[in-house]
């Protein structure tokens, strides 16, 4: 099998001719490509799924509202998964233990739940794993191969990547790097960090990605980022866009502060980050580097040297 990870960002997934498809969620993003028209955005997903052959099911997450709303519009076989009571493959008894997630999957026509583990924290990763298992089961892959493959899966780069320890004169912090840059992605990553490190403080360094995304989801970002225990904001990574007034790091910080959520620190020069971190990090903190821009370069530099001095 050839497995392709694709998204709707530029609608290029419409050129694929998949034999099976797995849809995890449908939520407004990349709207600049669709000229802000959500109906066009949904039409892209419909077109993608209608590229499936008549015998190829769409495996879809019933926990996601966008997915649930789309299912009645499809003229293809649909197999569902998730925690939802009506899911064909139902995720149950989820629990987190460190950087691992454990759950059971209740399958159609099988009396015994399938006990599964995946080496990534967070309910969203358990949901994604459930979707992968559902698709494998529909392909006829053996139960033993599914359990073994999932247990051996090491994750993908920049998705809650554990990059080890970062040290400075007063102690060390655990470095986690994550690519998520949509409010929902940031929210589930924060929750995963709480699940994995429930007795440790999470210090988030967040780099907003695109002025249009920051503008379009401003209130959502304020609510989600306000949940961090300590927040450092970098300037927006423009990705070729022109600046938009009120859609920058300073505006986010003011809105978070005005709601009394926390007191963010804004850094306009990335060379200042090391000094700021040295002043706010405590021993055993979790340093969560979050965003899709060049913040990944900063994470890599920290991981390579194991020291704040690398910045």
What is each residue range found by the language model?
Residues 2-7, 39-43, 155-156, 212-215, ...:
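Short gly/ser/thr-rich secondary-structure transition/capping motifs
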Residues 21, 60, 80, 204-206, ...:
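Structural beta-sheet core signal
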Residues 17-27, 201-204:
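Inter-motif core of Ras-like GTPase G domains
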């Amino acid at each position: 099998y050839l497995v392709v990870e694709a998204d709707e960002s530029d609608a290029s997934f419409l050129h694929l001719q998949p034999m099976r498809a797995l849809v995890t969620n449908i939520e407004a993003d990349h709207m600049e490509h669709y000229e802000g028209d959500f109906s066009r955005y949904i039409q892209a997903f419909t077109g993608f799924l209608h590229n499936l052959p008549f015998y190829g099911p769409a495996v879809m997450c019933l926990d996601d509202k966008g997915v649930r709303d789309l299912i009645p519009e499809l003229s293809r076989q649909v197999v569902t998964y998730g925690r939802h009571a009506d899911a064909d493959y139902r995720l149950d008894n989820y629990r987190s233990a460190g950087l691992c997630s454990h759950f059971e999957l209740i399958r159609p026509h099988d009396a015994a739940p399938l006990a599964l583990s995946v080496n990534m924290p967070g309910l969203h990763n358990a949901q994604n794993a459930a979707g992968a298992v559902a698709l494998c089961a529909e392909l006829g892959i053996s139960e033993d191969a599914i359990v073994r493959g999932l247990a051996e899966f090491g994750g993908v780069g920049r998705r809650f990547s554990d990059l080890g320890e970062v040290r400075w004169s007063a102690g060390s912090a655990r470095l986690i790097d994550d690519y998520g840059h949509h409010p929902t992605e940031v929210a589930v990553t924060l929750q995963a960090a709480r699940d994995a490190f429930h007795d440790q403080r999470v210090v988030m360094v967040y780099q907003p990605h695109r002025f249009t995304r920051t503008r379009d989801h401003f209130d959502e970002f304020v609510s989600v980022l306000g949940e961090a225990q300590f927040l450092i904001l970098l300037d927006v990574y423009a990705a070729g866009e022109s600046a938009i007034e009120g859609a920058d790091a300073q505006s986010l910080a003011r809105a978070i502060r005005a709601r009394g959520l926390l007191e963010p620190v804004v850094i306009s020069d990335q060379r200042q980050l090391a000094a700021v971190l040295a002043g706010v990090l405590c021993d055993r903190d979790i340093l969560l580097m979050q965003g899709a821009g060049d913040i990944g370069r900063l994470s890599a530099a920290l991981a390579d040297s194991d020291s704040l001095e690398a910045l």
